[in-house]
Amino acid sequence: NYRIRLTTDTWRDYYWRSVHPFMILLFKPPVDLLGFLLKGNKLWGAYVFVALGGALCVFLAWTFIKSATGNSVYASLIAALLGLTASHLIFGSLLESYIFLAASLLLFYVLLLKDKPMPALIAASLTTIGITYTNFAQNVIAFFAVKPNIKGLIRFAASVLVLLVLFTLLNNLLYPDAHPFFFIPSTLQAEQQNLFPLNSLRIQALTRAFFFHNVVAPTPIFYDKDIPFIQFRFFKPEINELSQYDLPIQNVTSWAWLGLLLFAGALFLWNIRKKQHLWISLALLGCMAFNVVLHLRYGKEFFLYSPNWTYALVLFLGLAWQTVSDRKWFQVLLLLLLSLLIWNNGYLLLTILNVLAPQV
């Protein structure tokens, strides 16, 4: 869908959904420019554009942690952690919009941390809401947590929503019939197909998607029973299947990750009263909670949406570990974790390439 929409003049949404109000307006011009610089090859331009989105996420994570802690080495380790997560490795390589959502959300937090003026926050939020309008809720949560002023929040939200309508109209003026208008209620009917019943397997899958599979990749499910291609999934509710950690490297990496997660939680609770960036940490938790509630019933494959919360998890951990960030032993631990992630998640990429190679 994105490959065709970004590299050809067929920009109409195949699924005719309204949740991406002016995504084409945001993505197609830079892809066209990169394609022009690459001798007219728009496909390579799209791949470079996505890779730049992934790189931007890493840079923004570094900027955020460096601004919060003043420690460049620690900031580099946390930025590398984000870049080496399964979520960012995959979506920094595929022609999809999710890596840019992560980048826009990261940018918003950087601007909040640096106490930038309202116009800058509005501009960052426009990118977020233009790609997928539901994620504007994350901007609202972050804004109100850091700037708890009702009038300011109303002014911020109203400005973004007014500009959203204008840019959506411009998007469909420049790219006719790209997708239906989001402000027409009937267009939401297309999302009914993405609603699933809440059961014990879904809750288990949700927990793993938010804290494990998005960082430490499990053994993927490859499915081709009733479709003309091989489907890569971590959760397949249609057949009640959920990916597991089967290999030794997967188990070692997941246990190491769990240990550092628990350590971060303990540090956060221990230092909660004297925490320098407490409200930003709470905002990050709030954004994760929003995604949990959203996906209780919405979404078939949670990993597909994982960039929407992986950034928040990594930034929260970066702030929680701040009290030990300058300790050499902890930096060595992070380096060891990064090494395990390179091995484990690199194996995932190799597996996907080997399975898909015969189809290319």
What do these predicted regions represent?
Residues 227-228, 232-236, 243, 250-275:
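Hydrophobic, aromatic-rich transmembrane alpha-helices
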Residues 1-13, 156-219:
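Aromatic-rich transmembrane-lumenal/periplasmic boundary elements in polytopic membrane proteins
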Residues 61-84, 277, 282:
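Transmembrane-helix signature of polytopic, membrane-embedded enzymes
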Residues 100-120, 312-316:
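Specific aromatic-rich, kink-prone transmembrane helix
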Residues 48-68, 263-267:
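Transmembrane-helix motifs of polytopic, lipid-linked glycan transferases
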Residues 93-98:
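Short acidic/glycine- and proline-prone juxtamembrane loop motifs at membrane-interface regions
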Residues 118-148, 159, 163, 336-337:
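Membrane-interface alpha helices of multi-pass inner-membrane proteins
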Residues 12-40, 44:
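Short hydrophobic/aromatic helix or loop-helix immediately within or flanking a transmembrane segment
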